[in-house]
Amino acid sequence: MQKFLKLVLVTFLFLISTLTPPANAENTINGEQIFSVHCAGCHINGSNIIRRGKNLQKKTLKKYGMDSLEAIEAIVTNGKNNMSAYKDRLSEQEIQDVAAYVLEQAEKGWR
């Protein structure tokens, strides 16, 4: 009987784990919405209409040391040069979400 209960419990836990979406899926969706509203005006499809060489492509992010969540969160929060700071417009969670979205899109080549 105990073996049966263990089997049922393990099966149940397995099914629950496969039905639950990844923890960051919602954050990425939120990040996409934030990006569309606040970032896409200058960074449409990962480009940069102000400074073409400072785009959001994976290679460029790596070149400038911006290929981590922390680095992207810092520049979104504080801004730099022509990039506006968003610390007064976005919550910390929104900044984290948009940073995750940018990294995910860079990995996918903004496709």
Swiss-Prot record:
It is found in: Cellular thylakoid lumen. InterPro entries: Cyt_c-like_dom, Cyt_c-like_dom_sf, Cyt_C6, Cyt_C_IC. Heme c binds at C39, C42, H43, M83. Binds 1 heme c group covalently per subunit. The keyword Transport applies. Belongs to the cytochrome c family. PetJ subfamily. NCBIfam families: Cytc6PetJCyano (NF045930). This is Cytochrome c6-like. It comes from Nostoc sp. (strain PCC 7120 / SAG 25.82 / UTEX 2576). The lineage of its organism: Bacteria, Bacillati, Cyanobacteriota, Cyanophyceae, Nostocales.
